[in-house]
């Protein structure tokens, strides 16, 4: 009699497991529970391997010199450090003062899925121009896996240009509050990347800091606030000017502009010479330099200085700036979102620093394709080609759209 009972119990248990699995992957249930599963995995990792602060600069870094020209990956832009051409904008018909208040018609709001603030904010931005998609169509195009925690501005640009080509897309850095108001007054919403703070820890000793995309659709001079369509906190959020600038600084004050083709002359006129990306970067570099001088303890000012120097391929100067930022203390998740330090330390030959940073980044975000890529390049510089190839292949597994990883694999195959 006991054998049928055991068989029945095993059958019921197996059936229950199957049903639970089917229920878990039912989209409404999966969207709710996957957040908790993501949290549980991160917290478990943090208990087993405690998360500390990002590594500070090495006291006497060894510089690896490689005389083979072919040993340098060609995955970074190569602009001139001094702009050779300054764009002359077409002036607006009449430079009238900014209105006291602007409230653009907000697009239909949607709550972001897990790790999806970029696609959600972009979906709302495109919806302002009557696009009929949602965050999931954007995420499906840009992210091989739902667990991908970062979508950068270049990836967002790729989506707009390939899926909403009737709109124009530009981004610049080093923005300021007045510039945001000018675009809003011209009828153009602005999307920015900014700091975000979790409500609770994802691991013991979590500093709670992360990144977030915010869509601005208005401002109010009387109340000194911007209106944000926030995919996490809700629609029509009133955000103080001071908070916007403080949170924005961590991302080099990057701003994204999406607009109709006939609005391009207006955009050029507002940007003036900063329509030229090199000129814009030079201005951002000088602004970051000034901030480091006015407050030498400003971590983000030093980090931004390093990023702008990296853009101009001034790698040794960039690593000096990054060293300052690291010694002052970076947020734990900083290298989940920004990768210019990897580029600067690689090209300056400071491979020990590169490996220390990429290994820390992978401890925080094990599926970061960018950290895997640059950890692989560090391995390559140390002559560990098999380890490098394993990193490159894993980066491509994490994001099958990642062309830099495919380039790296092909590069090793050719050398």
Please annotate each region the language model reported:
Residues 1-15:
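N-terminal Sec-pathway targeting helices
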Residues 36-100, 394, 415:
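Ser/Thr-rich, Proline-interspersed low-complexity disordered segments
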Residues 91-179, 185-186, 251-274, 297, ...:
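Cysteine-nucleophile protease catalytic domains, especially the papain-like/related folds used
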Residues 200-203, 207-208, 217-312, 317, ...:
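Noncatalytic regulatory segments and standalone regulatory/sensor domains
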Residues 307-316, 320-377:
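Alpha-helical adaptor scaffolds
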Residues 311, 347, 381-382, 411-415:
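Register position in tetratricopeptide repeats
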Residues 386-415:
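Terminal, low-structured helical/coil segments at or just beyond the last alpha-helical repeat
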């Amino acid at each position: 009699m006991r054998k049928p009972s055991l068989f029945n119990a095993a059958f019921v248990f197996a059936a229950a497991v199957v049903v639970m699995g089917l229920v878990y992957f039912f989209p409404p249930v999966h969207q709710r529970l996957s957040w908790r599963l993501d949290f549980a995995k991160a917290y478990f990792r943090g208990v087993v391997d405690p998360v500390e602060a990002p590594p500070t600069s090495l006291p006497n870094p060894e510089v690896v010199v490689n005389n083979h020209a072919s040993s340098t990956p060609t995955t970074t832009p190569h602009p001139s450090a001094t702009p050779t051409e300054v764009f002359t904008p077409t002036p607006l018909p009449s430079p009238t003062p900014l209105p006291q208040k602007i409230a653009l018609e907000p697009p239909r709001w949607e709550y972001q899925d897990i790790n999806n603030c970029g696609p959600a904010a972009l979906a709302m931005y495109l919806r302002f121009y009557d696009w009929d998609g949602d965050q999931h169509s954007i995420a499906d195009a840009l992210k091989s896996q739902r667990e991908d925690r970062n979508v950068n501005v270049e990836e967002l640009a790729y989506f707009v240009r390939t899926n909403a080509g009737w709109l124009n897309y530009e981004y610049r850095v080093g923005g300021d509050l007045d510039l945001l108001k000018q675009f809003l007054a011209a009828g153009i919403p602005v999307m920015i990347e900014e700091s975000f703070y979790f409500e609770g820890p994802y691991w013991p000793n979590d500093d709670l800091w992360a990144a977030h995309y915010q869509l601005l659709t208005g401002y109010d001079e009387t109340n000194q606030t911007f209106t944000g369509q926030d995919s996490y906190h809700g629609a029509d959020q009133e955000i103080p000017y001071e908070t916007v600038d403080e949170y924005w600084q961590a991302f080099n004050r990057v701003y994204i502009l999406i607009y109709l083709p006939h609005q391009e002359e207006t955009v050029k006129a507002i940007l003036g010479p900063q329509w030229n990306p090199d000129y814009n970067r030079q201005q951002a570099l000088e602004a970051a330099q000034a901030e480091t001088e006015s407050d030498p303890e400003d971590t983000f000012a030093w980090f931004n200085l390093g990023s702008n120097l990296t853009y101009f391929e001034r790698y040794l100067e960039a690593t000096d700036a990054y060293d300052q930022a690291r010694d002052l203390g970076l947020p734990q998740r900083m290298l989940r979102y920004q990768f210019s330090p990897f580029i600067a330390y690689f090209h300056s030959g400071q491979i020990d620093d590169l490996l220390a940073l990429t290994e820390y980044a992978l401890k925080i975000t094990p599926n970061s394709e960018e950290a895997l890529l640059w950890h692989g390049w560090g391995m390559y510089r140390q002559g560990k080609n098999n380890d490098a190839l394993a990193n490159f292949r894993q980066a491509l597994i994490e994001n099958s759209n990642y062309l830099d990883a495919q380039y790296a694999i092909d590069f090793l195959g050719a050398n």
